[in-house]
């Protein structure tokens, strides 16, 4: 799936429309996610932070190509219409949403957890202990350090930085940067970690 395969309207830096659904992403996500999914063969992808649904719709479309289960959580429903994807209007921090995510990680085969909610540090550190060997976890609005964000990203790649490597319990949870994918995804303000 390439940029030519879908309706794409750039509105401003950090926001575009995907089939009429607003997405808050760097538009170069389309350069990385298809190859990433092709190379990893995930069984389950879970997103925390649906927002207005554009990125969720894109991941859902990729799920149809690559054959993984996908669902997404947001405590606030900002969707303008009924989505084609499995949207769960629940907290990801506790209660039923938390239990579903833990169950999804535990019994979902090879899992990717996409962390893009209201407190990415909390969400990463909450679920990282449940990851299995060869699972992946990614955080959006990421930079390795604040200095790196100011020097290499702000005003160029992505203006927002809501988590850095030092915030994330990677060593405590046996997580490593995901080979070449970490180097690619930093170009769209996503971290990419895998469980040893």
Identify the residue ranges that each predicted region occupies.
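A short alpha-helical cap/connector motif
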Residues: 1-112, 118-196
């Amino acid at each position: 799936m390439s940029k030519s395969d879908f309706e794409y309207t750039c509105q401003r830096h950090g926001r575009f429309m995907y089939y009429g659904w607003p997405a808050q992403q760097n538009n170069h996500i389309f350069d990385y996610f298809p190859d990433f999914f092709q190379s990893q063969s995930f069984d389950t992808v879970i997103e925390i932070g649906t927002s207005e649904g554009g990125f969720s719709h894109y991941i859902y479309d990729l799920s149809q190509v690559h054959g993984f289960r996908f669902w997404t959580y947001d405590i606030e429903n900002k969707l303008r219409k009924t989505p084609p994807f499995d949207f769960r209007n629940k907290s990801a921090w506790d209660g039923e949403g938390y239990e579903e995510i833990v169950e999804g990680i535990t019994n979902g085969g090879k899992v990717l957890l996409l962390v893009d909610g209201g407190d990415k540090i909390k969400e990463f550190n909450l679920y990282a202990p449940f990851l299995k060997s060869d699972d992946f976890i990614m955080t959006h609005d990421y930079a390795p350090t604040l200095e790196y964000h100011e020097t290499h990203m702000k005003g160029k790649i992505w203006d927002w930085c809501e988590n850095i490597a030092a915030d994330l319990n990677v060593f405590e949870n046996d997580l490593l940067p995901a080979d070449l994918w970490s180097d690619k995804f930093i170009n769209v303000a996503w971290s990419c970690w895998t469980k040893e």
